[in-house]
Amino acid sequence: MRKYETVFILNPALDEEGYKANVEKFKGVIENAGGTVDNVDLWGKRKLAYEVKKVSEGYYTLMNFTADTELPKELDRVFRITDTVIRHMIITQE
């Protein structure tokens, strides 16, 4: 098991409940694959440095989790097919 960190930005058109529902969805993906979520930090709505997909702000979330080496690939796939995700990044913690 390795430690990972992911940051993702969600579309600002979501309401607060939709934002939290998406965060819970991604937590569920991690937990259903046998991983554990160590920390979730909801940064809220912030301005982007530049426009992405014609959007200038988004909901930022930082999530730390522990999982096997295959889970980040699955989580990346889920991020890519979820329309509300503007940008995401998954890194391995040292």
Swiss-Prot record:
One of its GO terms (biological process) is translation. CDD domains: bS6. SUPFAM superfamilies: Ribosomal protein S6. Keywords: Ribonucleoprotein, Ribosomal protein, RNA-binding, rRNA-binding. The keyword Secreted does not apply. One of its GO terms (molecular function) is small ribosomal subunit rRNA binding. GO terms for cellular component: cytoplasm; ribonucleoprotein complex; ribosome. Signal peptide: none annotated. Belongs to the bacterial ribosomal protein bS6 family. Binds together with bS18 to 16S ribosomal RNA. This is Small ribosomal subunit protein bS6. It comes from Clostridium botulinum (strain Langeland / NCTC 10281 / Type F). The lineage of its organism: Bacteria, Bacillati, Bacillota, Clostridia, Eubacteriales. The gene is rpsF.
